[in-house]
């Protein structure tokens, strides 16, 4: 099938700075893909490629050039994807898969589920971006007022003792039955101090921690997951 993929770059602006252990985001560059085919002139499929700077494994200095090259290859292959070759570019694979599936479904409702039919919701956590103590506390209180009962905090950017104090403040007012707490370090801890920090965090009755150390340190991560008193959820490690 003859097809065409148009690449549309955009810069999105955060309504408020989004802090992580790798820095604070105020903008986000994304590339939208428009998948079309002359055979079906009224159809279009839209996908989004959005690698996170300093976090995504395919955050490349020549990302735009790589994306353009891959899109031309997909056009030459009639819209077929080389899944094995694209595994190292997960954000590009996601954008292409979404655009192509959207094109052939002809609808944003890609799956027939109670959620897509508007019959049921999906429980999610209230995400708290990094900031100073008072700013994070204000975010938490706002999420709880909105009805969230699972709170996830980004940690690793401010002083660890301040982060502990913030978690202790929450626990002093709400038990684990009232509020489920999760934390995400985005690889902020070093292998040498990670275990001590995990032990201290575990005393606060947390549900889990995501990515305590940077991805790719498999032996260290294996040791931590086997010895940590706090359950570890893999995040960047899985990409």
Residue locations for each model-derived region?
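Active-site proximal loops enriched in glycine and acidic residues that flank catalytic Cys/His/Asp
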Residues: 185, 213, 236
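Short, well-ordered alpha-helical microsegments
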Residues: 133, 191, 217-221
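A short, conserved beta-to-alpha structural element at the edge of catalytic cores
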Residues: 205-216
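N-terminal capping/lid subdomain adjacent to the active-site entrance of alpha/beta enzymes
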Residues: 1-181, 186-188, 195, 199-203
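Hydrophobic "anchor" residues on beta-strands that sit immediately upstream
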Residues: 180, 206-207, 231
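Catalytic alpha/beta core domains of metabolic enzymes, predominantly
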Residues: 216-239
């Amino acid at each position: 099938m003859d097809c065409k993929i148009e690449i549309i770059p955009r810069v999105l602006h955060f309504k408020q700075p989004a802090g992580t252990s790798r820095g604070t985001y105020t903008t986000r560059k994304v590339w939208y893909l428009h998948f079309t085919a002359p055979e079906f002139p009224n159809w279009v499929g839209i996908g989004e490629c959005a690698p996170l700077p300093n976090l995504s494994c395919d955050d490349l200095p020549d990302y735009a050039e790589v994306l353009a090259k891959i899109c031309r290859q997909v056009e030459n292959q009639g819209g077929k994807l080389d899944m094995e070759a694209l595994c190292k570019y997960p954000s590009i694979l996601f954008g292409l898969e979404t655009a192509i599936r959207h094109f052939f479904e002809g609808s944003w409702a890609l799956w027939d589920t109670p959620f897509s039919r508007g019959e049921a919701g999906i429980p999610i956590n209230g995400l708290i971006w990094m900031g100073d103590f008072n700013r994070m506390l204000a975010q938490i209180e706002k999420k709880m007022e909105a009805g969230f009962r699972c709170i996830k905090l980004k940690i690793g950017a401010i002083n660890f003792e301040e982060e502990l104090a913030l978690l202790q403040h929450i626990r002093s007012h709400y038990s684990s039955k009232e509020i489920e707490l999760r934390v995400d370090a985005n690889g902020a801890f070093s292998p040498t101090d990670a275990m001590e920090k995990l032990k201290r965090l575990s005393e606060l009755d947390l549900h889990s921690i995501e990515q305590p150390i940077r991805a790719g340190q498999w032996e260290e991560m294996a040791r931590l997951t086997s010895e940590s008193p706090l359950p570890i959820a893999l995040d960047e490690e899985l990409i």
